[in-house]
Amino acid sequence: MMIDLPIDYNSILDTIVENVQTIPFRKRYWLIRTNSGTFYDTFKENNFVGLDHSQISLRDLSRLRARFHDDFLFLSAIKESVADFYTPDLETGERTKNDRSISLIANQIFKFYTQVKKGDLVIIPSYSSSKVAFGIVKETYIAEFSEEELDRIDVAEQFLNKRVEWIEDFDRVSLDPNIYKMFTAHQAITEVGKYADVIERTLQDFFVLENEAHLIINVQKEDGINARSLFGLGYNFLEILEDVIYALDIKNVSSNDFEVEVNINSPGKIDLKSRIKKGTVLAFLTLAVFGGGYESKGYTLKSDGLPGLIKAITEAINEYKDREQDRAMQKAIFDQYKDKLNVKEVDDMLKIMKQVDDNQDKPK
């Protein structure tokens, strides 16, 4: 005789959390200038980023690196080479660049050569930063271009180059205002890791950064956002989540675990975040179910494995949602707020499901 054992939703959520990829601690974020947009299209169309290094040749850089493995000594050697490039004026004996400028140039070359690594995220602005492109660095070492590439990309030889896979570009007006602060830095290359959460929520609906899980709700309403609708959406969603937690008997999770960061632009983003990753995953799945499902971007999945576990959770939430009349009323209220704010469906649902399934197949 077969006995149907109760489903342990806590174990299912724990398994999902274990397999959701965390943004690596070593990942860095770089703003790379394009000479007032001059090289924006060249970088985009040819899948690379570059830094002018006319003050020192790549051959000399490679020679210095082979000689000086210590970063401090390597940087000092670069500074000496850059200083030699700016020869003193014959009449005054002064260099055409002061020590501060020489140090700045050397530091930029050093950063690009040694610190921009595979897996890092790069951001490039067009003219007046009207467009901004985001990409992932594909190699740590300086790119070696073929003769054909050098013929096609007429500026390639004047740069230190690294290959990039471009993810997406955005009109500046559609970006989170907090990203604008990056563009106050005018150096050729600037590390912008302090904006990591803002950058990631521009690109993803769900991510884990520095042990904190983020669920992004995209509000797409074009004109002014009604305060009652905005706060009603948040309150009602957390009430639904609290009921789901109770109905599925989820342990050590509460709607009180969440903090919120709101970009109140129209359109804008609501960032629900918590260090209780299990709760954020449950909120993600709940939003997907109450938001209308998870058809997205043509992703296909295996029928077994972790997607099956995710399916069990979402089916349970669906069953909860449909069980009683007052829950139907609760969903109607949520839908009313969601529709007023034109909240985007959760695009990353199938991507996350595919991600955790792929992770399950990797050797531990």
What are these regions (language model features)?
Residues 329-363:
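Extended, charge-rich intrinsically disordered regulatory tails
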Residues 2-107:
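Compositionally biased, charged N-terminal/linker segments
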Residues 181-281, 291-293:
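Membrane-active, amphipathic/fusogenic segments and juxtamembrane/transmembrane anchors
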